[in-house]
Amino acid sequence: MKKEPIEKYIDLFCNLTISSIKNFDDIVEDNIEFSDPFNSVKGKENFKNIFYHMFKNVKNPKFRILDHSNNKRRTFLKWEMSFYAFKSKQIIIGMSEINYNKTGKIVSHHDYWDSLNGIFIKLPFIGFLYKASLKIFSMKN
């Protein structure tokens, strides 16, 4: 049975390596739009550069799909990304909205995740300020 392009796209993310990034060429549109809390790019080369940058800056990034929902031209994914940075394993939970055209090619991919709790809180100065503000503003049970 032939895989749909969205299935190929998801499989590529779940098995992504620096050498497999080039495989996006066959399943994304030339003018794909991508955004996440740190990036907003348009175009296939810029899209692939996001992932080359990821492999350059974190160790052993892995994606795991936790849940998904599809309709005719859109898929929503709940995912977990794990990687090593800041001297330990990091885990980020997020959601993606992926849109595709009539032929199944991906036209946009928008990631939504909590960058404050996922990344910034682990930075010494920002983490200290955030934890201090939680003591002030969080309701105690």
Question: Positions of the model-derived regions?
Answer:
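C-terminal and inter-domain tail/linker signature
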Residues: 1-141
